[in-house]
């Protein structure tokens, strides 16, 4: 029987704010699931305070490292650069066991940029990565202790889906709002389709927190678009299914370098929405092209506009995909992955 009574999680909890980016949501989900599944005391070190209350974060970190043997970390790129050497020191000094739950999908690039990362990562008990592709790339760089745990969310997967759709077909984006997530690509595609048909064939609703660096540009953009495009604000991560379940499909034309296993795809599948996504990072590992969505560019579909037009003209196929989406969504419920995490910590 495990003797573990407490662990710590170092990650971005968002302070007292309602922050809904992927890093914060993943950190909160892990904390809540472990809290519900174990009797452990779980300490929180919130990296949200790095610029707002740096002395508090430093003190919380020192207390955590001196008093806790098992530490899970979920860190941004800058967080890794600060915490990796500190954790490595305490690992060697006190035998601290570090479990790295990776945010995003570009760790292999960081290892190439910062060669010291290789030793840090190999000294951790495990690196939980979000895709098999990243695991293989890291293995080629000499990182040998990776296990795949995809993004998971405890969502109420729909039991049935809508089978009746007509013009205008409603599409949505459900992610952080920034240019690199393909927001402008999606707007341009929908506007171009409607213009070419001479009527409103499709609509686009955009959900998510607008990235600080993109706010001015996005506000200006929304002043110029047609009424077919609208911004719907933010939705709590556990309310996503209810918010998007009536849409025809989700658009995910991302080209963001930090993309890992996008939680928005789990949201979409749980709501029975096929996903139209770029062939970017691990999207093709999750979305089955022509099975529960479209990965483009492919042999027949070269861009987002073509993908949307294909879906509009192949309604029967898209509706059949919705059943596959719901089946796939059940793979991303937390239970099995939380058991895997607990087993690893208790070893």
Regions found by a protein language model. Name each.
Residues 8-10, 163-181, 186-192, 204-207:
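Conserved donor-binding/catalytic core segment of Leloir-type glycosyltransferases
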Residues 46, 203-217, 233:
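Glycosyltransferase donor-sugar binding loop
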Residues 139-140, 148, 152-168:
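Acidic anion/phosphate-binding donor-loop and adjacent secondary structure
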Residues 216-236:
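Nucleotide-activated donor-binding/catalytic signature segment of Leloir-type glycosyltransferases, i.e.
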Residues 245-259, 273:
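Acidic donor-binding loop of glycosyltransferase active sites
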Residues 251, 270, 274-277, 287:
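Short hydrophobic beta-strand element within catalytic cores of glycosyltransferases
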Residues 289-290, 294-301, 310-316:
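Conserved acidic donor-binding segment of nucleotide-sugar-dependent glycosyltransferases
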Residues 303, 310, 317-331:
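A short, well-ordered alpha-helix in the C-terminal region of glycosyltransferases
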């Amino acid at each position: 029987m495990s003797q573990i009574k407490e662990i710590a999680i170092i990650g971005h909890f968002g302070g007292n704010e309602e922050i809904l980016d992927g890093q914060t949501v993943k950190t909160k989900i892990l904390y809540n699931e472990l809290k519900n599944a174990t009797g452990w005391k779980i300490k929180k070190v919130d990296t949200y305070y790095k610029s707002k209350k740096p002395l508090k974060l430093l003190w919380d970190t020192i207390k955590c490292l001196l008093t806790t043997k098992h530490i899970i970390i979920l860190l941004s790129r800058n967080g890794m650069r600060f915490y990796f050497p500190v954790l490595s020191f305490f690992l060697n000094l006190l035998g601290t066991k570090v479990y790295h739950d990776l945010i995003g999908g570009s760790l292999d690039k960081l290892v190439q940029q910062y060669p010291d990362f290789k030793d840090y990562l190999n000294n951790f008990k495990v690196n939980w990565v979000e895709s098999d592709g990243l695991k293989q790339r890291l293995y080629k760089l000499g990182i040998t202790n990776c296990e795949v745990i995809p993004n998971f969310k405890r969502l109420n997967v729909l039991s049935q889906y809508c089978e009746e759709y007509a013009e205008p077909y409603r599409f949505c984006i459900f992610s952080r709002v920034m240019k690199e997530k393909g927001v402008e690509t999606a707007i341009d595609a929908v506007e171009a389709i409607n213009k070419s048909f001479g009527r409103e064939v499709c609509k686009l609703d955009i959900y998510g927190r607008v990235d600080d660096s993109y706010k001015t540009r996005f506000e200006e953009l929304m002043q110029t678009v047609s009424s077919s495009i609208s911004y719907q604000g933010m939705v709590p991560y556990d309310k996503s299914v209810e918010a998007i379940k009536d849409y025809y499909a989700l658009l995910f034309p991302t080209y963001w370098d930090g993309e890992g296993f996008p939680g928005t795809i789990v949201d979409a599948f749980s709501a029975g929405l096929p996903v139209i996504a770029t062939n970017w990072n691990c999207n093709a590992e999750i979305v089955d092209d022509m099975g529960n969505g479209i990965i483009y560019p492919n042999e027949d579909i070269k861009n987002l506009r073509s993908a949307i037009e294909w879906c509009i003209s192949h309604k029967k196929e898209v509706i059949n995909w919705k059943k596959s989406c719901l089946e796939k969504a059940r793979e991303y419920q937390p239970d099995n992955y939380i058991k895997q995490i607990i087993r690893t910590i208790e070893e």
